[in-house]
From Swiss-Prot:
Pathway stated in the Swiss-Prot or TrEMBL entry: Protein biosynthesis; polypeptide chain elongation
Record GO biological process: peptide biosynthetic process
Protein's name according to its UniProt entry: Elongation factor P
Annotated InterPro entries: Elong-fact-P_C, NA-bd_OB-fold, Rib_uL2_dom2, Transl_elong_fac_P/YeiP, Transl_elong_KOW-like, Transl_elong_P/YeiP_cen, Transl_elong_P/YeiP_CS, Transl_elongation_fac_P
Role, per record: Involved in peptide bond synthesis. Stimulates efficient translation and peptide-bond synthesis on native or reconstituted 70S ribosomes in vitro. Probably functions indirectly by altering the affinity of the ribosome for aminoacyl-tRNA, thus increasing their reactivity as acceptors for peptidyl transferase.
SMART domains the record matches: EFP, Elong-fact-P_C
Keywords associated with the record: Cytoplasm, Elongation factor, Protein biosynthesis
Source species taxonomy: Bacteria, Pseudomonadati, Pseudomonadota, Alphaproteobacteria, Rickettsiales
HAMAP family hit by this protein: EF_P (MF_00141)
Organism of origin: Rickettsia conorii (strain ATCC VR-613 / Malish 7)
Subcellular location: Cytoplasm
Coiled coil: none
MF annotations from Gene Ontology: translation elongation factor activity
């Protein structure tokens, strides 16, 4: 599917120079005093992992990869792979842990994830937007602390450090965003 250079967004997967590239940073739209407007795009090659900056004229159209998305359930780790099961057909696949990088610690047993395929090859794993985790370490509650803008550090059950409101204690469950690893609210 062709998209305008102005429509490129972070996370888009583009077919460029016969390779697949993922847009890794928010594209910068620039309109210089002389010459035509352009879009500066930082992207990463999905095969080699190399990063590249490209300028595309605002009038350009690029090929956006047509991805098929399927729901999979995470079962367990097997060496350096994740073992996932298709929730519809119950087929199992192995995918490298590297595909999740720093978000690997959010993965819990039986979690439903979205796997994106291009030509029947897994390209990307999308975690749910938020997860519920328990606080395993934090400073004690300060008497009289309210839901103000002051935060303290907390370490969650998966080892991730987040800033949480002063009134939260060890053992409480909180909702955390998986994309930027930030506190959302106390779990209900």
């Amino acid at each position: 599917m062709k998209i305008s250079a102005n429509s490129i967004r972070t996370g888009n997967i583009l077919v460029y120079n016969n390779d697949l590239w993922v847009v890794s940073k928010t594209p910068e739209h620039t309109q210089p005093g002389k010459g035509g407007a352009y879009v500066q795009v930082e992207m990463k090659n999905l095969k080699t992992g190399t990063k590249r900056n490209e300028r595309f004229s605002s009038a350009n159209y690029l090929e956006k990869a047509e991805l098929e998305q399927k729901d999979y359930q995470f079962l367990y780790f097997e060496g350096d792979d994740l073992v996932l099961m298709d929730t519809k057909h119950f087929d199992q696949i192995n995918i490298s842990k590297e595909m999740l990088e720093e978000k690997l610690s959010f993965l819990t047993e039986n979690m439903i994830v979205k796997v994106e395929f291009y030509n029947d090859k897994p390209l990307n794993i999308e975690l749910p937007p938020t997860v519920i985790l328990e606080i395993s370490e934090t400073d004690p509650v300060i008497k009289g602390a309210t839901a103000t803008a002051s935060y303290k550090s907390a370490i969650l059950e998966n080892g991730i450090k987040v800033k949480v409101p002063q009134y939260l204690e060890i053992g409480e469950k909180i909702v955390v965003k998986t994309d930027d690893m930030t506190y959302v609210e106390r779990a209900k």
